[in-house]
Amino acid sequence: MNAARTYSLGILAGGQGARWGGRDKGLVAYQGRPLVAGITLPRPQHAGEILICCRSHPYFYQHFADRVLCESVTNQGPCAGITALMSAAIYPTLMILPVDLIGAPEQVITTLESEWQEDDTAIFLTDTEGRHSPCLRLHVDTLADCEAFFDGGGRKITGLLDKVGARPIPVDAAWLKDADLPASISP
């Protein structure tokens, strides 16, 4: 692997699954396999490591990751998971994806790989109307800013993206579709 292009891939799987009746979305079957497999299989070529931040079922997730970790404070939203993943990453940049990304995971990964520029601190994918999913890439040097944001009560990804000076990358809205509701994966 080209060391300059290698990154840590972090998957956010710590949600409460409230709209799924408390189910862990990463374990939900979609197209014959668990949602987490849609991101990790096949393994992205430039992912030097795969990290999964989950709220439960680490024994299951260990089959899809190099390391599995939990948020230090549970049920605090995706910023807690992002901070935990950044703390564990061993490569200079960390790509973050939600476990329930079903739109176009391969295109999302390729775009976050190809759009990254040497002077970026963070980039995130957004649709043409400004809506986003937690599909982003951050330099690990932003960890202190992420921790300060979270420790100061910040819970919204948009606030975190502002704090680290993230650059938006517009993509087709269909790419960012996730399995927010059971109906989103129904035939």
Segments (PLM) and residue ranges:
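Nucleotide and nucleotide-moiety/phosphate-recognizing core
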Residues: N2-G154, T158-A179, A183
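Long, highly charged low-complexity segments
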Residues: S186-P187
